[in-house]
Amino acid sequence: MAPWSREAVLSLYRALLRQGRQLRYTDRDFYFASIRREFRKNQKLEDAEARERQLEKGLVFLNGKLGRII
């Protein structure tokens, strides 16, 4: 599992936003709103395991292992 850190979270956030700029057949506004909503929802997590789980979920989504929204 990826170690949680502020830098890792920000890096994931930026990578997801960059990926969103390349979307063709999907509503970009919906994609960006979904990314922002998920990050804000998990912003106040205090449990280290929960943070790492959410970071891992984001990395899996970024790498397309769950299917991309394209």
Curated annotation (Swiss-Prot):
Keywords, comma-separated and alphabetical: Mitochondrion, Ribosome biogenesis, Translation regulation
Short motif (LYR motif): ranges: 12-14
GO biological process: one example: mitochondrial respiratory chain complex I assembly
Localisation: Mitochondrion matrix
Keyword Mitochondrion in record: yes
Entry function: Assembly factor involved in the biogenesis of the mitochondrial-specific ribosomes (mitoribosomes). Specifically associates with intermediates of the mitochondrial ribosome large subunit (mt-LSU) and is required for proper ribosome assembly, possibly preventing premature association of the large and small ribosomal subunits. Thereby, indirectly regulates mitochondrial translation. It is also required for complete assembly of the mitochondrial respiratory chain complex I. May also function in DNM1L-mediated mitochondrial fission.
Notes on the domains: The LYR motif mediates interaction with NDUFAB1 and is required for the function in mitochondrial fission.
Subunit annotation: Interacts with intermediates of the mitochondrial ribosome large subunit (mt-LSU) (via MALSU1 as part of a complex that also contains NDUFAB1); regulates mitochondrial ribosomes assembly. Interacts with MRPL4. Interacts with MRPS27.
Protein name, per record: Mitochondrial ribosome and complex I assembly factor AltMIEF1
Gene: MIEF1
